[in-house]
Regions:
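Glycine-centered loop/turn motifs
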Residues: 2-5, 83-90, 201-207
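Anionic-ligand-binding alpha/beta catalytic cores of soluble enzymes and soluble regulatory domains
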Residues: 102, 107-193
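Short, surface-exposed ligand-recognition loops at beta-strand->loop->(often short) alpha-helix junctions
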Residues: 1-3, 70-75, 197-203
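Glycine-rich, small/acidic residue-mixed loop/short-helix segments
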Residues: 18, 157-167, 177, 181-232
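A generic beta-sheet turn/junction motif
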Residues: 15, 26-28, 51, 189, ...
């Protein structure tokens, strides 16, 4: 992670199961962590727990900054922008970066809340329905809403983190590495987190069956549902 490259990362349990995921962006002498709004307090507390006595200051700046999304095409209009996942530029004081998970998600911009409307005007951006963004994310297969429902229920590698540039198998030790590496190296990946859509009705049962065989389990039941689906 540096001034021109942001990344996708996660926190796992010692067993390699999902806890949190977030984006990391270089900011002055520190870093921004961009995560789901509902997970801010829990992530802050978890990081504060890991800090121990290290000389690291962790701040919750969610009341000072806001994140907005823009299209890949709009991002590439900016001077110096490159069509590379995670590529980051700075427009005045605002960080703009192409989503490191999938370019199809477009770019994100971190804006000081007090200057939000001024920044959007100078960037020639206009507000749109936020559900359009989450619908796109759901179609691509990236869970960004109600991710607390995944905690301790699914391995990070089953969340497609390798495909989303969120796992580096050349990296040194990290919490959850042993099981993550074992699943990868021994080809033990037997299920994945996938988006599901209802033809009609509503989700009443967690279990998903195909021809009387259990093939998966619904983990996120809300507006943009996801399930852990087994390979057949």
């Amino acid at each position: 992670v540096n001034e021109t490259n942001s990344c996708f990362a996660s926190l796992l349990t010692p067993q390699g199961k999902y806890l949190f995921d977030f984006l990391i962006i270089k900011h002055k002498n520190g870093y921004f962590l961009d995560c789901e709004k509902l997970q801010i307090d829990n992530l802050f507390n978890q990081l504060d727990l890991y800090k121990l006595r290290s000389k690291v200051e962790i701040l919750n700046l969610s009341n000072e900054f806001v994140v907005a999304a823009l299209s890949n095409e709009k991002f590439l209009e900016f001077e110096g922008a490159k069509n590379l996942p995670g590529f980051t530029i700075k427009y005045r004081e605002d960080h703009i970066f192409l989503d490191p998970r999938k370019k199809e998600l477009g770019a994100r911009i971190i804006v000081n809340l007090e200057k939000l409307y001024l920044s959007l005007k100078k960037l020639d951006l206009s507000a749109s329905n936020i559900d359009e963004y989450y619908e796109l994310s759901h179609e691509i297969g990236i869970a960004q809403k109600n991710t607390d429902q995944l905690k301790n229920k699914i391995f990070g590698i089953e969340c497609n983190f390798e495909e989303l540039n969120g796992i580096d198998f050349k990296k040194g030790c990290y919490i959850g590495q042993e099981n993550t590496a074992r699943i990868k190296l021994k080809n033990k990946l037997s299920k994945r987190l996938l988006p599901i859509k209802l033809i009609e009705g509503e989700i009443k049962d967690e279990i998903i069956k195909y021809k009387d065989h259990e093939i998966g389990k619904v983990l996120i039941k809300n507006k943009f549902p996801f399930a852990s689906i087994k390979y057949l």
